[in-house]
From Swiss-Prot:
Ca(2+) binds at E157, D199, K239, D241, K243, I245. PROSITE patterns: PROKAR_LIPOPROTEIN (PS51257), SUBTILASE (PS51892), SUBTILASE_ASP (PS00136), SUBTILASE_HIS (PS00137), SUBTILASE_SER (PS00138). GO terms for molecular function: calcium ion binding; peptidase activity; serine-type endopeptidase activity. Optimum temperature is 80 degrees Celsius. Is active in a broad temperature range, namely, between 50 and 100 degrees Celsius. Thermostable. The gene is fls. This is Fervidolysin.
Length: 699
């Protein structure tokens, strides 16, 4: 059975049958077991725990999102950890663990009474979207489409004839007279960049190495982690000097942000972690970057990284990401799956036509395609930190080293360069305006309109420069707010999909506040699908303003998931929010004859037995409808006198239309038992019980 994880505080809605049965709610057992608590106000979800799938996260640290920084100190003490990174811009800290696994840290944290903590999550594993090093095939471009030929590749550089990608996207020397990305800062969030390469001299400004909190001086070799970032940087902004190659935006400046560092220093594959990626993105944003290139990704949904991306876009930064090299349809990879980004597929040109590259990931989030096959660009020199080899047959006279790579990692920087050029012409453009301009002016070479392979088609800089900047057709942020039926608490970890008629889609998950944020998306008509919560996420249930000590909010029933759909919802500057109220139904019926017991009653309690929400006389085959309650409840049977023998009490819970057998054992000498589908399972201890609960949203 799938585990569905959900938490909420109880809304004190007492059914009519309870209110007339025992208005004082006096307990039948000791006060410490069933203390009277007639009302609990809804507090919402207090701590959200990121998913832990084997092999998809790294050990050694946890990331904590907070509202109250002082509460973080309790976590640090409990896990015997050390704060190694502070991100006040998004209210996140990174805590290094000392000999403790992430799962063990979760267990320690769930035992605390905390206020003001939003989430705890691991750092997920990410990979560079590794390119293939290729030897150029001289016959590859012999059969040419009219207008795509070597004589048109005159960029005044000695290797102009190799730059088929620039020609394909409409770059000309005349175009650069209008705009070349002059003074636009481009953050290459990647391995480091060799700023001493002859084609990058003067192009690389100060950057940042977040894992070591080190500012990288302008013009230096920072190619920690390998050659990937240098190749990306050359495609974007290699200088125009008559030698070597030239980038799409030779007037732009490169800001290296090293997130794939030296594996010998940071471990693993060199990935510094979601926390340091967030630090790098924030640093780049705060230091003037206007567009960022991300040619990397992975599977885990990181709230920290999502907030960093949102932070950048809120400050007007355009985020360009590679679609990936997985060939098949790929969904829920990040950062490509975050809303508001420009996701780029890789294209090839062969036999007189363009086509999607065989390795390029297909996705319902692809925006545009760009050249990604046999791309010549800069690589670190032989004496450089990140030297990984070069193509010795490239006839450059400037002493620089070059190589041919292919992958969506090579496609994305073509688009990033295009964005830099456009931002020179449209310096106040919002991220959604730039993306929409690219999509509106793309070359739909296969005539399909938008598709999973190439998005809206091949990006065309010449057309985009001539096209007007859209003033309509986008919103700066759209929100989907998911709450219980009464709107008392937000529901986190709910997946929200926004699908358009053409099949393209945006995805996001609700955060601890129950809000899914979609920054800088297109306006228009969407079919919106809401479902969850995500069964891989965990949370702590709130209680009277604090998290329940030990309350790992595990609801073990698929039937507790809720879904909602909104067909034809119009998103516009005047309609930037959708409110979704989940609702539930829950009825209980017992089949066991309890006539031998003294005054048995059906009792609804909170999972810690701190409060009695209602009671009524027990009756066999009577339906008890709890559908007006919202939050987490447990229930059981209580008698006036102890049972003489063990009695197994059986029944059925009908939860959202699904029948679930339940039972509990009233042991000899006791007066009560919890009833559930696990036989009254106590996740806590006798002195601090935590019973399996039922999560419902009310009506």
């Amino acid at each position: 059975m799938r585990k569905v994880l959900l938490i909420a505080s109880i809304v004190a809605l007492i059914l009519a049958l309870f209110s007339c049965a025992n208005p004082s709610f006096e307990p039948r057992s000791k006060a410490k077991d069933l203390a009277s608590l007639p009302e609990i106000k809804s507090q919402g979800y207090h701590i959200l725990f990121g998913e832990l799938r084997d092999g998809e996260y790294t050990e050694g640290k946890i990331l904590v999102g907070y509202n109250d920084r002082s509460e973080v100190d309790k976590i640090v003490k409990a896990v015997n950890g050390k704060v190694v990174l502070e991100l006040p811009q998004i209210k996140v800290v990174s805590i290094k663990l000392n000999g403790m696994t992430v799962k063990q840290a979760y267990d320690k944290i769930k035992a605390l009474a905390l206020k003001g903590i939003r989430y705890v999550e691991p750092s997920y594993k990410r990979e560079l979207i590794k390119p293939t090093v290729v030897k150029p095939n001289p016959d590859m471009y012999k059969i040419r489409k009219p207008g795509l030929n070597s004589t048109a590749r005159d960029y005044g550089e000695e290797l102009s004839n190799e730059l088929w990608g620039l020609e394909a996207i409409g770059v000309t020397q005349q175009l650069w007279e209008e705009a070349s990305g002059t003074n636009i800062i481009v953050a290459v969030v990647d391995t480091g960049v060799d700023g001493t390469h002859p084609d990058l001299e003067g192009q690389v400004i100060a950057g940042y190495r977040p894992a070591f909190d080190e500012e990288l001086p302008a013009g230096t070799d920072s190619s920690y982690g390998g050659s990937h970032g240098t190749h990306v940087a050359g495609t974007i902004a290699a200088k125009k000097d008559g030698k070597g190659i030239v980038g799409v935006a030779p007037g732009a400046k490169i800001m290296p942000i090293v997130i794939f560092d030296d594996p010998a220093l940071v471990g693993g594959n060199g990935y510094v972690g979601d926390d340091y990626v967030a630090a790098g993105i924030i640093w780049a944003t705060d230091h003037g970057a206007k567009v960022m290139n991300h040619s990397w990704g992975g599977w885990g949904y990181s709230y920290t990284m999502k907030e960093a991306f949102d932070y950048a876009m809120e400050h007007g930064v355009v985020m360009v990401v590679s679609a990936g090299n997985n060939t098949s349809d790929s969904h829920h990879q990040y950062p490509a799956g975050y809303p508001g980004v420009i996701q780029v597929a890789a294209l090839d040109y062969y036999g007189g036509t363009f086509r999607v590259a065989g390795f390029s990931s297909r996705s319902d989030g692809v925006s545009v395609g760009a050249p990604g096959v046999t791309i010549l660009s800069t690589v670190p020199g032989e004496d450089s930190i990140g030297y990984e080899g070069h193509n010795e047959n490239v006839p450059a006279t400037n002493g620089g080293t070059y190589d041919y790579y292919q992958g969506t990692s090579m496609a994305a920087p073509h688009v990033t360069g295009v964005v830099a050029v456009l931002l020179q012409k449209f310096p106040n453009a919002k991220p959604w305006q730039i993306r929409k301009l690219l999509e509106n002016t793309a070359f739909d070479f296969n005539g399909n309109g938008w598709d999973h392979d190439t998005g809206y088609g091949l990006v065309k800089l010449d057309a985009a420069l001539q096209g007007p900047l859209p003033t309509q057709g986008g919103v700066e942020e759209f929100q989907v707010v998911v709450t219980d039926a009464k709107g008392n608490f937000g529901v986190p970890t709910v997946f929200v999909s926004m699908m358009r008629d053409n099949g393209s889609c945006y995805y996001a998950k609700t955060g601890p506040d129950g809000i899914a944020r979609f920054p800088h998306i297109d306006s228009g008509t969407y079919d919106i699908f809401v479902g969850g919560p995500d069964h891989w996420d965990r949370a702590l249930a709130p209680y009277d303003g604090e998290s329940i000590p030990g309350g790992y909010a595990i609801a073990l029933r698929m039937a507790e998931e809720r879904q909602a759909s909104f067909v034809g919802f119009g998103v516009s500057p005047d309609a930037t929010q959708l409110n979704v109220n989940f609702n539930s139904t829950l009825q209980v019926k017992f089949s066991t004859n309890l006539s031998t017991l003294k005054d048995p009653q059906f009792v609804v309690v909170d999972p810690l037995l701190r409060g009695v929400y209602g009671r009524v006389a027990y009756a066999r085959n009577q339906t008890y409808d709890l559908s007006l309650l919202s939050g987490q409840i447990s229930f059981g049977i209580q008698t006036l006198l102890p049972a003489a023998t063990d009695i197994t009490i059986q029944g059925t819970v009908t939860l959202n239309g699904e029948d679930i057998p339940v039972y509990g054992v009233l042991k000899a000498g006791t007066t009560w038992t919890i009833i559930d589908d696990f036989g009254g399972l106590n996740l806590g201890t006798d002195s601090q019980p935590i019973y399996v609960w039922w999560t419902i949203f009310g009506q």
